[in-house]
């Protein structure tokens, strides 16, 4: 039966045309070109969506290099685009990575809450990184972007990112259960410091608000109409092994994944002589491409070329992004 099935379109056109998608994650092993692929996908989405945000959660922050423009923890418009924005967060920095404006208020209550919240969170192992994502999600949801693309860190960090809603829900649940015990102590503490306008209700309300947002995000992450994951790999053993592990973990978490990008491929022309190394690499890639075809026959598998020049700058990414929408044809490559 499976042999009679038509192969799925070898592109990301299915994602670009799925206008219900809200969150798109792009991830894989380090060094496979995730940032180029996620940036290219964001560019294509900007053609059909009202507003697009790409977020780097990789401490290396490669999207600044990709677009040749410095980005910060505040969404910034990408040069050359009217509706594409980018921001970079460091998941290891916890709440300290958030824009200060987030904690602005008419008094010092929210600023004090930031410090108190950080201390309380530090008492719960493993939740700090997750809380950073949680706060970013709260910020992003308030900005009403049509779709958000995550340029994720290598696989281990990515799996933690995917799991963060459950971690935060569990952690916040513990904090809120302790709320009644903590509130009187916190009120006494701030009164001793002469800050009568600060009370535990401020912190409590903030935690309640965050839990509500994260519960909603958790539901959206597991809804294939709203969230999907794009795996990026190269045609080598370790990358393919990591991709299979990632696909299995995503499936276990209930995250939709049906697109794989195989990057940095050689497209040798039989009519041209090639060096022995190129021919050897080509054979290796062909072997793993066959394995990918067998493993992921029910996936959209997009094949991208290894280029002579690096893909950097908005115009270069805009040009490269076309390869996501239709199969790459080396014969159609413009001659210089």
From Swiss-Prot:
Q: Name one GO molecular function term.
A: metal ion binding
Among the entry's GO cellular component annotations, what is one? GET complex
Which BP terms from GO are recorded?
tail-anchored membrane protein insertion into ER membrane
Print the keywords alphabetically: ATP-binding, Cytoplasm, Endoplasmic reticulum, Hydrolase, Metal-binding, Nucleotide-binding, Transport, Zinc
Any Pfam family hit = ArsA_ATPase
Q: Report whether Cell inner membrane shows up as a keyword of the record.
A: no
> What family does the database annotate?
Belongs to the arsA ATPase family.
Q: What is this protein called?
A: ATPase ASNA1 homolog
